[in-house]
């Protein structure tokens, strides 16, 4: 990863924060699904592009790694990057975002811009019939 792309991102620090430093010399085919997800996230972040588009970046991760990944994505937002995430894991992302778009069968069915608690309640009301 370090030599593949010239970027202002501190690769060593990024890999350390994601917990993947010990695995950098291993072929990805020998990594677990979760570790592969972490490597993919590190690669996306390391590009330095102003926009990150991530499809299910938390799938295959244990709760600790999901938090680590959310922290990394939050750091990128705080640095001024825009992050678009496609995910089914609402609980993990509720504290990370300020906007949620619910898409069903390719159609936008609802947009919510609010606090994480309001968002969770809106989701429950809309998709699970309330608490």
Each model region followed by its residue ranges:
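Conserved ABC ATPase signature
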Residues: 27-34
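H-loop (His-switch) and adjacent beta-strand-loop-beta switch element
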Residues: 100-113
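Conserved ABC ATPase "signature" region
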Residues: 3-24
